[in-house]
From Swiss-Prot:
Residues 1-23 form the signal peptide. Keywords: Calcium, Disulfide bond, Glycoprotein, Lectin, Metal-binding, Secreted, Signal. Lectin which recognizes specific carbohydrate structures and agglutinates a variety of animal cells by binding to cell-surface glycoproteins and glycolipids. May be a calcium-dependent lectin. Disulfide bonds join C27-C38, C55-C154, C129-C146. It comes from the Eukaryota. Belongs to the true venom lectin family. This is C-type lectin lectoxin-Lei1. It comes from Leioheterodon madagascariensis (Malagasy giant hognose snake). GO terms for molecular function: carbohydrate binding; metal ion binding.
């Protein structure tokens, strides 16, 4: 009987963690928890603006994911490695006007940067948005034209 209770408790703990319920934050059932935030990978291809709009409609207060630390970057990379299937993925970093500084769509500040080794470029004077690529194990940022169609990750 004791073994059955222990096994049942273990299954319950695993079920809660798979449903995105972390010890420090409660997320919607199909979102994943890290620190005090929730994340969801969306496997639909959209341009950056449509992806940002989709996140906001999906859950109140949701935006494309901002990445504020190395630990958060590693967590997002792990989620994408398990769910993105060798795709490029939009995050919430964008250039609101040509040749301006980048901003996070959720309004958060810059605490961390993860630019790819070849660094940020804007050679053709167009607006850019930022993606993560499987080629860098989803750890390095790359700016591309916002009209590109990628899958994306939302954060609340």
């Amino acid at each position: 009987m004791r073994r059955f209770l222990f096994l049942s408790l273990g299954v319950l703990v695993v079920a809660f963690s798979l449903n995105g319920i972390g010890a420090d934050h409660h997320c919607p059932w199909d979102w994943f928890s890290f620190d005090r935030f929730c994340y969801k990978v969306i496997k639909q291809r959209k341009n950056w603006q449509d992806a940002e709009r989709f996140c906001g409609q999906l859950q109140n207060g949701s935006h494309l994911a901002s990445i504020q630390s190395w630990a958060e970057s590693k967590y997002v990379a792990m989620l994408l490695s398990n769910n993105a299937f060798l795709d490029t993925v939009w995050i919430g970093l964008f250039e609101p006007e040509k040749n301006r500084s980048l901003e996070w769509s959720d309004g958060s500040g810059f605490c961390y940067t993860g630019w790819e080794r070849r660094k940020r470029n804007n050679v053709d004077n167009k607006k850019y948005c930022v993606e993560l690529s499987w080629m860098s194990d989803y750890l390095e940022w790359n700016n591309v034209k916002c009209e590109s169609r990628n899958i994306f990750i939302c954060k609340i």
